[in-house]
Amino acid sequence: MNPLALQPISGSLHGTIKVPGDKSISHRSIIFGSIAKGTTTVTNFLDGEDCMRTIDAFKEMGVPIQKNGSNVTIEGTGLSGLMEPNKELDFGNSGTTTRLMLGLLAGLPFNTTVYGDASLSKRPMNRVVDPLRLMGATIDGKEQGNYLPLTITGTSLNSIDYDLPVKSAQVKSALLLAGLHSENTTIVREKSPTRNHTETMLQAFGANIKSDGHTTSISKTDDLQGCHVEVPGDISSAAFFVVAACMVPGSEVILKDVGLNETRTGIIDIVLQMGAKLTIQNERIVGGEKIGDILIISSPLTGVTIEGDAIPRLIDEIPILALLATQADGTTIIKDAEELKVKETDRLLAVSENLTQLGADVTPTEDGMIIRGNTKLKGGNFKSFDDHRIAMMGIIASLVTEDTVVVDNIDCINISYPNFVNDLQSILK
């Protein structure tokens, strides 16, 4: 445990920050680069613990990967060139690595056992395992394969036409990766569009894939081709500074080179709806992904309702938006967010418990919470639940509390944003 005590601030936030590379895209760049033929180069790779688990897994399967800071070079072996690992694969805390790799490993001609830390071992895997079994996959583990560790017995896979019962880009991506192995076309249908980095990047690598936002089809592709991936800044990391600059009076912050993929920008839509002074500058397309600079100037805010199709576009930002809601006038209602119960921790519980501890007026509901705003927050102990996004939320909360906030463990921040505290200190004026 590595606690951090944060005193109340007297100033405001001013300056420019370049947030680290997008976690979702960093994971996928390693996966697709490894199963492609030829060289893939990656710039602005997220140097966090989760993404390193993905690199380590492919190194164990014989893929030459060189990492120099945030630059990565992958000498892809192609799907047929991956080798059976000599030991079990440790995915640590990374749900993305686990779920995507289950789809990939299911169709490879060897057996693999995968495991993770205590937190990951509590996260349900049947949402991926069940449809993979419909494709012919053989996956065994605790409680009928619902929890790690899992053993995947490689086999030939059938195609599938599958309606996603959950709003999960990870499940969609796992099935699309499995579809690379199957002889016929695999189709994945979703009611609400989730993040589409897998579809966008597979197209760039030469896969036979089509998508209209709700329906994605993929056919067997003999060989993906290596390419260059420039990873944009992670909007989920930028969200903490967006909220901080909105809340702290007199603040003005610029966030450089942030990914603005429309399946991820729900946070921007919601804070604008609340009355934020936020503008996008220098907008451009890089490697098929929209990026730009975000300028935020503090302003009074009003509560809103966050629900429905907005949820998958901001699922990771709900904790920090809940904090913002405590400082907005009126009531904010969050619903349809039951997916947060199966993240690194039960984030609905973690958010409501911590905000209540700080003096916020929060009523938990089955699929979200009701937050009555314009609340003075006191200090106190803040439980990270060993969840990086909850820990960073606690640090940002200290900017608007009357007394000291003690976050019980900040080591988990290394999963997605190792330099978070230093970056925040750099704009405290």
UniProtKB/Swiss-Prot annotation:
A single MF term (Gene Ontology): 3-phosphoshikimate 1-carboxyvinyltransferase activity
Annotated phosphoenolpyruvate binding lies at 23, 95, 123, 170, 347, 389
Any keyword Cytoplasm?
yes
Gene Ontology biological process terms, A to Z: amino acid biosynthetic process; aromatic amino acid family biosynthetic process; chorismate biosynthetic process
Q: Could you tell me where this protein is found in the cell? A: Cytoplasm
> Does this entry carry the keyword Cell division?
no
Give the catalytic activity: 3-phosphoshikimate + phosphoenolpyruvate = 5-O-(1-carboxyvinyl)-3-phosphoshikimate + phosphate
GO CC, any one term: cytoplasm
Read off the SUPFAM superfamilies from this record. EPT/RTPC-like (SSF55205)
Q: What top-level branch of life does the organism fall under?
A: Bacteria
Q: Where's the active site on this chain?
A: 316
Pathway(s) annotated for this protein in UniProt: Metabolic intermediate biosynthesis; chorismate biosynthesis; chorismate from D-erythrose 4-phosphate and phosphoenolpyruvate: step 6/7
Give one Pfam family. Answer: EPSP_synthase
- Summarize the subunit comment: Monomer.
Q: Give the family per the record.
A: Belongs to the EPSP synthase family.
Function text: Catalyzes the transfer of the enolpyruvyl moiety of phosphoenolpyruvate (PEP) to the 5-hydroxyl of shikimate-3-phosphate (S3P) to produce enolpyruvyl shikimate-3-phosphate and inorganic phosphate.
What is the protein's given name? Answer: 3-phosphoshikimate 1-carboxyvinyltransferase
| Species of the source | Oceanobacillus iheyensis (strain DSM 14371 / CIP 107618 / JCM 11309 / KCTC 3954 / HTE831)
Q: What's the name of its gene?
A: aroA
